[in-house]
């Protein structure tokens, strides 16, 4: 019995020493493209855990050319998110949008992909105009870079914070169903109680509506 216990303890110590030698994080081993679509590509990412086990993680990306670790996590932002209020910071722009991936209406911030050659601020102005008809006439801040769905994708966003004005117009694309609106803090608090939000929009609106 003592001999078995000693062997068990020895094995545990050796395993712990091995983990220390490897470091405290998983080791990237490689990435394999599994399926390429028009807008997203699915990959299997292989890691080795600290105890030497293989971990295959399924993920999707906007990029169709991820071949190494640097391309997995070192890329430029894919999209912009626009956080726009009126001049007095009393109302915020939210889109009520039908999201096809979930088959439901969701409240979120205006957002969209950054076109090749565009700066994030340019993309923000274009996307806000296309989705709502409003003009982003002032940019106060640019927050980057964040992951939009870190559980299964390396898609990244830059948040553009600024002021908007103008009249609402229908989206310029029939592939999107969007109803934009101005909302006061009291109205946002009521929306949060009753309706579904994109996670980042929900978190920001909760804090903003209570300032």
Residue ranges and their predicted role:
Residues 1-25:
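N-terminal amphipathic/basic-hydrophobic helices that include classical n-h-c signal peptides
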Residues 33-36, 71-74, 150:
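Short Gly/Pro-enriched turn/cap motifs at secondary-structure boundaries
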Residues 76-83, 88-126:
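Conserved Nudix-box catalytic region and its N-terminal flanking loop in Nudix hydrolases
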